[in-house]
UniProtKB/Swiss-Prot annotation:
Annotated function: As part of the Ragulator complex it is involved in amino acid sensing and activation of mTORC1, a signaling complex promoting cell growth in response to growth factors, energy levels, and amino acids. Activated by amino acids through a mechanism involving the lysosomal V-ATPase, the Ragulator plays a dual role for the small GTPases Rag (RagA/RRAGA, RagB/RRAGB, RagC/RRAGC and/or RagD/RRAGD): it (1) acts as a guanine nucleotide exchange factor (GEF), activating the small GTPases Rag and (2) mediates recruitment of Rag GTPases to the lysosome membrane.
Name used for this protein in its record: Ragulator complex protein LAMTOR4
Organism: Homo sapiens (Human)
Gene encoding the protein: LAMTOR4
Statement: the UniProt record of this protein carries the keyword Lyase: no
Lineage: Eukaryota, Metazoa, Chordata, Craniata, Vertebrata
Sequence similarity: Belongs to the LAMTOR4 family.
Family matches, as PANTHER family: RAGULATOR COMPLEX PROTEIN LAMTOR4
Subcellular location: Lysosome
GO cellular component, one term: late endosome membrane
Length: 99
């Protein structure tokens, strides 16, 4: 069952799973990230650390999106209000570039 909270996440191409967090608690999850409390904790800590960086004075939120790229997948993190949306996406293979 798709809720208003997750309907957009389920339509993301190459999506392998998602987490929706609020204050470190998992509100919704699916796929590879379903009920993954360890990932939720690590991502919450990462977001907290990233929020500590202030490149420009006066910014309310220091970032909107954060990408953590691994070999075969990427974690895409978006902060919206009090919620953190995390999507695990499959990285698409690329053809080698001839130089």
């Amino acid at each position: 069952m798709t809720s208003a909270l997750t309907q957009g996440l389920e339509r993301i191409p190459d999506q392998l799973g998602y987490l929706v967090l609020s204050e470190g608690a998992v509100l919704a999850s699916s796929g590879d990230l379903e009920n993954d409390e360890q990932a939720a904790s690590a991502i919450s800590e990462l977001v907290s650390t990233a929020c500590g960086f202030r490149l420009h004075r006066g910014m309310n939120v220091p970032f909107k999106r954060l990408s953590v790229v691994f070999g075969e997948h990427t974690l895409l993190v978006t902060v919206s209000g009090q919620r953190v949306f995390v999507v695990k996406r499959q990285n698409r293979g690329r053809e080698p570039i001839d130089v």
